[in-house]
């Protein structure tokens, strides 16, 4: 028969039956940031660590661990097991407008620049607040300000633009130079993490462990909004109580249950109860939190060490032990609590994640209330006052280290060129480490790192089994600050120091530790070998020793290690806390002298930063250049999104065709192609590469009065252009 080229527009929020051989085309997202396509039965892809979700940074899960590409084939699951929903179309009145934003329409600010949608997002205050980490004014500003979503956002985290905190502390002590730095603890889902002076809402692909303060956490019922925040949108955080957060979730659960069962009357009633007016009313009543994130505090006499319980959203509890200092005994106390909770299980307690001096508990508030959990923990307070006799099995793992590896130098160079040209740790992280620790030369830095025995205090800092470790001997603890702002790129398995801690990056991604070199893989995605009996290589309380190798030798080791062809030296040992404490006491005078010298150099660095105006950093990346006015015969090629002008594909004087790609804009970790819709000649390029851009802003100015020299050739018939058959698109 004849070709059927008919095109049918399909409504959203509706179940459709698609005929075999059809092609489904998806257009632009009109509201929010993401659109979702659900297929009956789902896509048949293998599970990885119990999930089919794609983790592109880790390169596993989903389809080949990456974003889809043209030509990929996706097998569908067995439709025999699929049950269609009772409702095949969502009633018009129940369809969220503007993806749930308070104000869905884009408008203009006082300067006439395009602004995005405005959102209200419900959060719980904590785990970190005033007066410990922030000032009271900081907290008022945080909840009173309308934060703007930065274009450099993704599933890892939503970066925000807004006022810089004044901070309650001068610095982070041994955790780092900046007052946002703390000793690493686990992060709750949806927590708002201040990486230096810049807040980031941690998303589903965000880190599980890190060393930055978090003043608020998005509650469970509000986390869906994180997936629809687009660059340029504005957010106001609404301070909820735990009871309000729970009530919103109960209502939301009822809406979903009514939707699944097709009970329209119940659904409309529940939808009305969960309208945005609820958050607006709460915000008007409570412009900032009127409670504390600290739920309970025990003295050292009551708990063996000071114990602080901090609220971290409506399904996490952060327990901190002792003072805010690096003390290995506190890590063992957290370990003892975790063992006790394993021996005394509590229904609804889903996960435990230890930090340097903390233990975070993830619980299901539907089945376990916070009050019940806190009552259960009172038994641990009594049972675990003394942990000095604890003894554990451990290993010494000998790792190769390519000192000042070219991959580290590349990351530093990229950071200096694209993020912060005047950073005090550039162009050499090693020189910065030397200077801030008062060492004679870089050789002394190398000697200290290679002679130290590093105790692994936690895994997953930041991802994929990455260890956070510290020298057992306090006289070998080098202290640095972390990058502010963080790097956008770090090579896999780079080794760095941040605060008093060493980290091996488990995968390529952002980072903030000061580089010393690079080592072998910490994670093996698919292959099991003698040393990779699990995907992760290391265990908590392993002791790491580094030995130097050349860059070329490391490259060969990195090829052999995942295949099981590298002879990694691992020795079994034991660690008894009481014996270690005795050794520390024996060398206390030397340790105190070392700390005094280090602190003097540390303070000198701070003073120098203040003198040079480098203690704080103001992000200029998002500043938008003003657009030139256009004459009658000129046409501006505009950007549809907020972002950064990544690359210009044309130069002044070039003739362009209709549909030609003329620029690339980076937004939300994606490259957006900017195409012309008409032919013309480029007469001006008003925006420089690397500049911030906003919707409606002309990136390229064309003259429509000038006839493009080859425009006739550009208008070739459709059948002369490249096409894909239906078989090729499957």
Where are the language model's segments positioned?
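A broad structural signal for short, well-ordered beta-strand segments within beta-sheet-rich domains
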Residues: 183, 349, 645, 682-684
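Conserved "landmark" site that anchors the functional core of diverse proteins
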Residues: 1-624, 726-728
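Short histidine-centered loop motifs in beta-beta connectors
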Residues: 222, 227, 530-531, 646-655, ...
